[in-house]
């Protein structure tokens, strides 16, 4: 089981926020969100939505999605706060063709107009205030050409899984056959819509690492209101990248809002 080393922790830069070197070191580990079976359907949909226009990924990270899009010959730009994450984009095919700007996705602007702005893998929730999330929508809309679209992929909070009177839901329990393992759990504050995602990794020798990342969840209806504030209107909402319908059993949604051709 891999994990950040003490040297990685020593290199962490506070300017990288919640995704410094110690996180970036493991971010591209095989499997999970990096599995080609997960990535390729996403890239297919995004490429189709972009058509002949340019794409902008907010919170581009290590280029998990942006690099494969660029490898297909698409014009891809990205905004990312963490230099440690961005340093890994060029390790991927197509990564050297992604134009990255270091900055905050709530306010950083890049040149040009885009047919698609997108924000995937729950990253809207990394913005932990309602005003900040609204600012993301406003910034996305400012980058869109008329008729352009803003796409978000985000999980639905597992509030129905909370035991009565409790605030914690485990999402992964993964023992390692070699010893140790990994446990992940979310802790919710249903009053403020804040939650923390907690990650505990234990190695075979008994040493471990704990990481906590704060989030703010927003229901689809709240995101639609944010979109309206930004001048966007809902175009599609799916349960997953296969475009299946959103149901009461869905654990996430992929939502797309469109910028009108005129006011």
Question: What is the predicted role of each segment?
Answer:
Residues 62-107:
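Class I SAM-dependent methyltransferase SAM/SAH-binding core
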Residues 218-263:
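C-terminal lobe and adjacent flexible extensions of AdoMet/dcAdoMet transferase-like proteins
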Residues 1-61:
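Conserved class I S-adenosyl-L-methionine
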Residues 134-146:
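A short glycine-rich, Lys/Arg-flanked "PGG" loop and its adjoining helix->strand segment in the class I
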Residues 109-116:
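A short acidic, Gly/Pro-enriched loop at the edge of an enzyme's catalytic core
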Residues 118-120:
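A conserved beta-strand element that flanks and buttresses the S-adenosyl-L-methionine
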Residues 151-228:
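SAM-dependent methyltransferase
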